[in-house]
UniProtKB/Swiss-Prot annotation:
Miscellaneous remark of the record: This protein is produced by a bicistronic gene which also produces the major prion protein/PRNP from an overlapping reading frame.
Induction of the gene: Up-regulated by endoplasmic reticulum stress and proteasomal inhibition.
Name of the protein in question: Alternative prion protein
GO cellular component: mitochondrial outer membrane
Subcellular location per the Swiss-Prot or TrEMBL entry: Mitochondrion outer membrane
Primary location class: mitochondrion
Length: 73
């Protein structure tokens, strides 16, 4: 404990400095990483979800209303 508050050799920062700074950076980076991961998951899952929903709706509309397209035209 005799080095408490003394600069780390080669780092030029006090011993007590990196802990809060790295802690805040880690929390900030983790939140951004989770946000990015959720965004990538949403971007990856959303098209499949929309494709599945559109396919079910299209198949259902064709099955129950086969003349809907012809009537629209």
């Amino acid at each position: 404990m005799e080095h408490w508050g003394q600069p780390i050799p080669g780092a030029g920062q006090p011993w007590r400095q990196p802990l809060p700074t790295s802690g805040r950076w880690w929390l900030g980076a983790a939140s951004w990483w989770w946000l990015g991961a959720a965004s990538w998951w949403w971007l990856g899952a959303a098209p499949w979800w929309w494709l599945g929903t559109a396919s079910w709706w299209w198949l259902g509309s064709r099955r129950w209303h086969p003349q809907s397209v012809e009537q629209a035209e």
